[in-house]
């Protein structure tokens, strides 16, 4: 039998849900360094802060895995540094991070293991140090001595 809830009880339930959601949201905003903006609309934030807000939203669902697709795209150096600290802190919470990124400085500094694709085909896998020395990666992304100069 399902209990019947009157309008007043439903309001109380909704109020408690909202308090819990606000507590979770503020916790995640603090985690990414945006707690001072908790009353602001997301669209009014600077670009790098908007990206961190997106990460905070994802973290509010208590994920086991978070996929970050080009999170540093369009960020300046300071915003990228802030992002690297957040990614490292996410990993320290025991959350797996799948990072899809073209900012090689970020990738080489933050990742433990790399998988490199060229046109959807796996060409290398390993630590950043191993991948940097891989001939297939050098050929695909840095060019070879045999390539013509444009």
Where are each of the predicted segments found?
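Glycine-rich phosphate-binding loops of nucleotide-dependent enzymes
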Residues: 1-150
């Amino acid at each position: 039998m399902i209990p019947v809830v009157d309008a007043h009880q439903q309001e109380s339930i909704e109020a408690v849900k909202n308090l819990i959601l606000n507590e979770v949201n503020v916790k995640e905003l603090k985690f990414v360094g945006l707690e001072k903006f908790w009353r602001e609309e997301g669209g009014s934030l600077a670009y790098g802060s908007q990206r961190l807000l997106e990460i905070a939203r994802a973290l509010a669902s208590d994920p086991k895995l978070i996929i970050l697709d080009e999170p540093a795209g369009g960020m300046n150096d300071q915003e990228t540094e802030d992002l690297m600290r957040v990614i490292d802190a996410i990993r320290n919470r025991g959350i797996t991070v799948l990072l899809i990124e073209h900012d090689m400085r970020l990738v080489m500094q933050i990742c433990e293991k790399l998988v490199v694709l060229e046109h959807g085909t796996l060409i290398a896998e390993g630590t950043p140090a191993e991948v940097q020395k891989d001939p297939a990666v050098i050929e695909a992304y840095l060019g070879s001595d045999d390539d013509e100069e444009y």
